[in-house]
Structure formats: structure tokens, C-alpha cells
Amino acid sequence: MNQSIIAASWGPHGRGAEISYTIADSPFGRMLVAVTPLGICALSVHQSDEWQESELRRDFREARITRDDDAARPAANAVLRYLRGETAGCEVPLDVSGTAFQLSVWRELCAIPEGATRSYGEIAARIGRPSAARAVGHANGSNPVSILIPCHRAIGANGDLTGYRWGLEIKKKLLAFEQSRADRATLNSPIQPG
């Protein structure tokens, strides 16, 4: 995935944002996709629709939020096609808010190839802040569009899976899904002369 991350078109807590959302079944649970006119601003996976709606309203408490399946469906369908293995990637614009540091972490997460992982320390070093592994972890936890900005690819220094907002079981499933896709891509690639 090579995401186009747009710095938020709205103010703190969604001030000035017009957000539409939909909820659909995904291979990883119920999925909420929220969009502005510029892109996806929130994506969550959970078993409870009510909990996801409550989180969206809490995170964007100053936005005008409407459940509008028609407006959000194209973005949700793009994500679902990717999660079902029907497309090679999910390149949809993102309209997200974060500090300059968070945005640099999120861009680096998007650069990690499917099927690969990086430690928080490796991510910190790649963005030029080698002593900021803990801050990278906090930026990971602040990611509003989990899966699309693949924070599940970040792991502990010892290789252990670490916390994930939607639970370690979903993190394991996402990593297995991506590894399977990466393995298939390798099997289907032409043999290079050597």
C-alpha cells in the first residue's frame, strides 16, 4: 500500500469537518469507515457498532457526523476489496490529523512492505530519531486509520507482537493475511535471469 496522506482539512477534534460514515462486515470484524470530502479520516475494526460510533463521535466531537452509507460506501468498498484479496492494494486518499512527528511515523509505516515488520526502534531510526522508539509507539497508538496506515507492522525490539488498539488477535490475523499476500506475489513473480 502506498497511501496518500493528506494533512487534515479540519481543525482539532474535527472542527469544521463534515464526516460521513458506514459500517460493514469485513474479514476482521465489523469495520467503520468515516470519510470527509478529501478522504478517509477514520477506520476501525470492532465487534460492536455502537462502540465504534461512540469512539468516532468522541474523537471528532466538534465535527458534523452523519451515518451516510451512500457517501462512505465507495471508500469502504475499496478497503473491503483489499481485505478480501481482490485487489493488489488499497490506495485511497487519507484525510488525517497528526503532529509533524506522527505524520512522519505514519509515512514510514506505509513504506514497510506487506508481509514485513519493523521494530519501533527501527522505525525511529528510519525517520532520523533513533532514540524515539517510545514516541513512535505513541504515534502508532494515535493512528486514526488502522490497516490503511499499517501500524500492525510495528513490533517490539525482541520481535514480539505488542499492543494493538483492536486487539492482538486482529493484529496477528492482519500480519498473516499480508504474509499470505506477499508469499503469493513472490510465487507469481517471473523468474529473473541471474
Language-model segment annotations:
Residues 131-173:
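Short glycine/serine-rich loop segments
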Residues 1-131, 177-194:
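Basic nucleic-acid-binding alpha-helical/helix-turn surface characteristic of O6-alkylguanine DNA
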